[in-house]
Amino acid sequence: MTDNFDIFRKYIAQGGINENSTGSDKVVKIQLLRRGKDNVNLPAKNYSFKTYYIDSIEKYDKSIDEIRECCRMFGLRAYISVNIKSKKDVQMESLKLISSYVYDGNCQKPWGIIDRSYDLARCDDKRWVIDIDAQEDIDLASYVEDISTVIETCKSSHDKNIICGAPSKSGYHLITYPFDVCEFEKRMEILQADKWKYSADIPDIKKNGLSILFEDI
């Protein structure tokens, strides 16, 4: 089981989500997904079960029990966007999409506009997810520490690149500010050559990524 509600409660509070929604312009997306590999008797395609738009810590706290129950009942995983958006920017993207759909005569599945608008909306404080998979016969904590050291030495516009970390079902996620990817890849190649046991591929960098919030599969 993976339960990162406490980690991301602190994360979204630091990212500008207020205790209540009064006067708040910030919103974060939580998505409940049914993944094909978790449900072998169902179609392999990933399926979006439900989406929450959280604009306050109060709403976040009230959603926790329902999210856990849904995940357990239907074999879902809950993911949270690491990029907190402005409601105004999401609304502006919605207007653009609606206008383009009407102009093009595209009337199929209009209910997906908000989801897409959230993803398209700009983010003033961009964050990435570094997806680290556990490796057989390698201590995950040491592996994460070595990768963290590499990330912190890469050029960026911040004094510290790593914001926080969260366990995942198959490893660990590091939430970071953007950094020099070319430098990261070169340093990872050096690390892998120096420590021959690190034979896995370089961790994926998900630039508009989701991190795992909860799963009990």
Where do the model's predicted regions map?
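Signature for HUH/AEP ssDNA processing cores
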Residues: 1-168, 179-187, 208-217
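A common structural junction motif
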Residues: 155, 188-200
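Short hydrophobic/aromatic beta-strand micro-patches
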Residues: 175-177
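Positively charged, low-complexity, intrinsically disordered RNA-binding extensions
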Residues: 196-207, 214
